Amino acid sequence: MWMGVGDSSGSPKPIRIVVVGEKGSGKSSLIMAAARNTFHPNIPSLLPYTNLPSEFFPDRIPATVIDTSSRPEDKGKVVKEVRQADAIVLTFAFDRPETLDRLSKYWLPLFRQLEVRVPIIVAGYEVDNKEAYNHFSIEQITSALMKQYREVETSIQWSAQRLDQAKDVLYYAQKAVIDPVGPVFDQENNVLKPRCIAALKRIFLLSDHNMDGILSDEELNELQKKCFDTPLVPCEIKQMKNVMQVTFPQGVNERGLTLDGFLFLNTRLIEEARIQTLWTMLRKFGYSNDLRLGDDLVPYSSFKRQADQSVELTNVAIEFLREVYEFFDSNGDNNLEPHEMGYLFETAPESPWTKPLYKDVTEENMDGGLSLEAFLSLWSLMTLIDPPRSLEYLMYIRFPSDDPSSAVRVTRKRVLDRKEKKSERKVVQCFVFGPKNAGKSALLNQFIGRSYDDDSNNNNGSTDEHYAVNMVKEPGVISDTDKTLVLKEVRIKDDGFMLSKEALAACDVAIFIYDSSDEYSWNRAVDMLAEVATIAKDSGYVFPCLMVAAKTDLDPFPVAIQESTRVTQDIGIDAPIPISSKLGDVSNLFRKILTAAENPHLNIPEIESKKKRSCKLNNRSLMAVSIGTAVLIAGLASFRLYTARKQS
């Protein structure tokens, strides 16, 4: 158990094995002995690339073995080869202790400095004069080294008298690449690593067809045939159970193999040097060397879209996620607590929301738990901004479909939405623009139920973008008509934000928030609106724009209401929406944003394109506008002042 081993890689690309070490440590001799099955006492100081065909190795995967120079002046060439290596063979000679010392004093520290993260095999060259090293085994000699440098997979001894050992060195180097120990097993503590446990749990649950938490004899046989194309005979299963009852009683019962027993069996495979069997099973279920699902399993064609299209979860995926939530919300209190979330993602490499991007982006309960609305909102956000990651994690939590692409859909182009004068998008992305201290972060806090003075979303001078996501729904239960709103705060750089056309095309609605008590804040917000609307119009990806008058708990600047109303009327958008995050009064802003998105043909600023404006600028100069008078020229005075300033 398991019986039979198939090809665990299937990759035709040759594996690059780079041989490194001090002069006289046997680098070139090792390569020559392995490749030609003969020992040459007189060989060149540096061999050319040695290509070993697939027939050379049991796994029938070719390799290119690269000799390196020991001369200090050739260090740059060695570094280049090491950076491109799939595996490194680090050599020393038993009769030259200084070559062993250099492994820990120079070569291994160098590899760490270069951040080389490939398997390393230490090869000890045994000379004829055995008294030179007093019959110490290579395990005794290298044990301290391997404890200090865990990247060393194994150490192997070879000699000119036993040429098959030279082949073994290269074979182990290749196997360390094809079936690496490092990702799956903690050799210091002799336990499976967390990612390997997660992958094996997923395989166990996928193989447990009746979902009783046990792999029956029939289910074990199906797993065996899937992975190795060879069934188990009844006596083999019986023998496995008998051994398990003696060595690990909790691993088996009268109905079959438990999850703990399954993990125990796979641990034994590694301890018995049968790691290839484990990797064969992992790869049959789509895992790559980093124990994530391979790119070939993620249907990237499902995400092909134009710049003004987005990706959303389908109703099938949403219903699946609801069922998952209800299953792991063990007490049914509509609060998926952190430990319950941990159980949910036990079959994934880690939680998908550990990245800083997802920190503090949705509403959390006092204990850090998530309501169903917040849970679904996070999935919608991940699907919007990183569709492959979303689909990958749906597969980790066992989305029940042979076609993973059925979990997502690409929305209609926004240009077609405008022609139809309606949008059916269920996830709306709203870009939040505004000058510094206008109240952007406070608005995002308000949206996800955080306090007005919570500074977790404050940019603190950062130019990074920040998200907040939540469902905007009518009171009552969640329905298919509820929509998810994503607020994306666009941080302002010192030289202006100047988002690219492609970045702006993803915007469904833009709001421009300003401090209603500060005239400069108002003028800056108008400048931003003009710039954004112009870029959008020139690119052909226009979208509704709204002005938001924040901090209405403060006294407005003189003629604020009259001026803001006149400007918005002249450019064809709604009057500014008054809000006060401090008082918790947002005037139903979030519903108004969704309404604007549902009517993509409205609230489009009437702004001239740069081309038309350039022609007019050649024929007349722009009039200056005095502070407080706000005399508009065709409703675009603030915009033209901004343009004149940019061109001066």
Swiss-Prot record:
The record ties this protein, via SMART domains, to:
RHO
This protein's gene is called MIRO3
CDD domains annotated for this entry? Answer: Miro2
**UniProt binding sites for Ca(2+) 1:** 208, 210, 212, 219
Q: Where in the cell is it found?
A: Mitochondrion outer membrane
Q: Which residues carry this modification: Phosphoserine?
A: 11
Q: Which residues form the Miro domain?
A: 12-179, 425-599
Q: Which organism is it from?
A: Arabidopsis thaliana
Print the keywords alphabetically: Calcium, GTP-binding, Hydrolase, Membrane, Metal-binding, Mitochondrion, Mitochondrion outer membrane, Nucleotide-binding, Phosphoprotein, Repeat, Transmembrane, Transmembrane helix
Parts of the chain on the Mitochondrial intermembrane side: 645-648
UniProt binding sites for Ca(2+) 2: 329, 331, 333, 335, 340
Check the record and name the Gene3D superfamilies matching this protein: EF-hand (1.10.238.10), P-loop containing nucleotide triphosphate hydrolases (3.40.50.300)
* One GO MF term: GTPase activity
Protein name, please? Mitochondrial Rho GTPase 3
Tissue distribution = Expressed at very low levels in roots, leaves, stems, flowers and siliques.
Mainly localized where?
mitochondrion
